[in-house]
Amino acid sequence: MTDLQETGPSVPSPDKSKVRVAVVFGGRSGEHTISCATAAGVLSAIDRDRYEVLPVGITPEGQWVLVEDDPAALELSDSRPPVTITADGLGQGVLTAPLGGGELTVLGPTGPRVLGQVDVVLPLLHGPYGEDGTIQGMLEMMSVPYVGCGVLASAAGMDKQVTKVLLGAAGIATAPHVVVGPHAWKRDPEAILTACQSLSYPLFVKPSRAGSSLGISKVERPEDLPDAIEVARAVDPKVLVESGIVGREVEVAVLQGRGDDAPRVAEPGEIAMDTSQGAGEFYDFETKYLAHDAVAMVCPARIGPEERALIMDTAARAFEAVGCEGLARVDFFLTETGEAVVNEINTMPGFTPFSLYPYMWQVSGLGYTDLVSELIELARVRSTDVNR
């Protein structure tokens, strides 16, 4: 592991002419390294003339530490060990909420360090303990403005089964599936396997509450299904078994509208994979983040005008059905018959240089830096009332 230790970076005095943004990344989930890579992209892109940045890392143990403002040290690379934030044995950092806003206290080499007023928190946490409504709930309790979806949408977007329930209620198609509950597999595995007989092969077995394609397996034969369920259960005890959908993988970036305006939708993009260059059979972790030469981001997607309109309209409907705010990426399968089937909703999509979300907005006319600024400004004007 490449450890990024908190060694006491200097903290600038608050600049009253700038908005103070705490960029929070790392975290306790298995996507810790991906979160650091996302932070690297955002720290490189954020407008330093408008925003004063406090880079705050969360260790895998849950400690909050101030780290050096060095995006290169956070980047994901297949030529070095994964990045991990450490606190070198220090205690817990805290975010407090005095009257009038949030005040951040993190760990220093000699004890707690008060960083002062924070205007906005930009949580770049992927997976559990970050993207699932946990940090959002903490910030809501303290009335601290933050970027992205609220508690409910974050929690629903994290749980693929709950997402399907909400989308189904809105009349939006998803893949046929069977839920393997946390205790059901241990209690009666044969009942689960029998239920899965109604699904069409190949099957995709995935953790219900994880991202970055962690723990996902493609299953071609019934005899391989139990092992695939165990692989997914190692990431999350709640598992989803889905029928494979034959279709092109199309992704859509959605951005909250200003005021009461409708959600804004970027040009759809798609993933083109070259297995001869190291891509897997599907868009797994290695293909997504390490096999850069094997993956091409195509935007606009190579689809017709009717399909484009359908995909964009469905993405906006899905965004609102789940109650998203700020941003989300809606992933589709576009079948040969022209049906748009939602695969998942990602409420904190990756912002790495290899991520499709910022690229789709760039193609649509909103550059990386302006996109980050827009997200921060949306958070600043959003009510901190939990019933907004």
Residue ranges: model-predicted function:
Residues 220-313, 339-341:
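Phosphate-binding site of ATP-dependent enzymes
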